[in-house]
């Protein structure tokens, strides 16, 4: 697999504001928690971006990235209720996850 890269300042902001880091994303990708690799849904505004969909514990995060020949450059980490429902097919109380 290609190398991963990111902006360290962005990583610190994500750690402080969302409680997750790019290192954790890479760990989960490397340990089988990658659920999908998708084209960015807004290809007009983000023409060269794709999205990793990863599972971290019982929640799904979307991680936009740009790919070149040597690496994946991770842009941000977004917790996603919608993706959690779409990708995790479990019943939890009255809510269906997935």
Locations of regions flagged by a protein language model:
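Ribonuclease/tRNase effector modules and their secretory precursors
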Residues: 1-98
């Amino acid at each position: 697999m290609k190398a991963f890269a990111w902006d360290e300042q962005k990583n610190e902001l994500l750690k402080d504001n969302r409680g997750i880091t790019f290192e954790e994303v890479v760990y989960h990708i490397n340990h089988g928690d990658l659920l999908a690799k998708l084209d960015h849904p807004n290809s007009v505004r983000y023409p060269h971006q794709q999205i990793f969909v990863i599972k971290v514990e019982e929640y799904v995060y979307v991680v936009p990235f740009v790919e070149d020949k040597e690496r994946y450059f991770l842009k941000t980490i977004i917790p996603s209720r919608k993706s959690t429902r779409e990708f995790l097919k479990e019943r939890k109380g009255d809510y269906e996850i997935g």
